């Protein structure tokens, strides 16, 4: 199997699902991509905004069969409203998604991951963002790097 790249769904109370869905439609080579997030939430959010994309729920990357579907590695999340999830559940969900991607990257199950935007308040002021959170988890002090690209 090709080395996979994960996309961490990020903040559930946002337009991340829309960005992921619209980007998915534009991507030609989908062979090595999958999402880490809550399957039902992403499916309902995409349906709610009126986009038509085939989505598959997977519980392991070994279950990725249809490369044209948006494969979502399911992370549990209880919710009643698709864009109004309480702060504690949001925090726990986002941290679980990031930690899952981190574990998979450390075990070399995935080549790397990209995280969709998150509300920095989930880190309770301990970290500026995901980059610093991951640097801390890996005992990297003041050497964290963030890649940015701008055509201008």
Regions found by a protein language model. Name each.
Residues 1-152:
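Anion-binding alpha/beta catalytic cores of soluble intermediary-metabolism enzymes, centered on
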